[in-house]
Amino acid sequence: MIVKLNVKALTISSVAIFLFAAVLYPLLSQPLLEPFTQARLDALNQSGQPVLVAIHADWCSTCKTQERVLQELLPQAEFKRIRLLRVDFDQQRDVVQSFGAQYQSTLIAFKNGREVGRSTAEMSPVRIAELLRLSL
């Protein structure tokens, strides 16, 4: 009797874990960071999705700090809807210029397709969170 209950409990637990994973995997597997393309920004803006564009350079220590801060903030419930698009400062110069950004480490927040905030070289989690809130 005890063995049957344990097998039954194990089977129920296994099914529950499978269903939990099947439902949550698509949500959890969304990338925090996507490479920037104009088509992707347009699609997100048209859907009303909040967007943060990060102008980033791999050699930039400020950019690396910003990325760590964003990796901590974006999974939080408050910010989960925000999509992060990364512009390569060195490889996408035309995009950098189209945003009017003079420096790497520029963060630009969009809400309903409109720019609502911008910062350059900001590394404070509190201030970056304030910028993210503008896009919500």
Where in the sequence are the language-model features?
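Short active-site neighborhood of thiol/selenol oxidoreductases, capturing the structured segment around
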Residues: 46-58
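Typically the conserved alpha-helix immediately C-terminal to a functionally engaged Cys/Sec
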Residues: 64-78
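N-terminal targeting signals for export/organelle localization
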Residues: 1-35, 136
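Thiol-based oxidoreductase modules, predominantly thioredoxin-like and allied folds used
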Residues: 55, 79-94
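Extracytoplasmic/secreted envelope proteins and their assembly/folding machinery
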Residues: 38, 42, 67-71, 93, ...
